């Protein structure tokens, strides 16, 4: 059978995935372009929020969109505080790093391929300056649906149907 149309989903490591709307099976889908309209839940989740236009992060570089980073526990949401939060994943990546012999949360030499690497620079860092924790925090606080700037905001969701 020939497939004329399909949905294309993209997921990268510690990011929330994104999915195209129904597209031609032979079409090139550029998820970074604003011309590509990704699928979003809109108001269909019935949790009081409108996810229209929020399947991707449009505040990284003018004219482009990116995946939302920070899903360290890979549960389809980004969350800063307990339970099931992504911050603890970063914290324990730091504490358990093989070279962090004293178990310091402010360890500054944790290089490698770790879940808590928010900006994918090959280094995980929990305390200032230029740490992954505050990048995650800022993204959650300023997420467009987090109107009250809550650290325990629990509705930052991947917009791919299960």
State where each predicted segment sits.
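Cellulosome-associated attachment modules in secreted, modular CAZymes
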Residues: 1-162
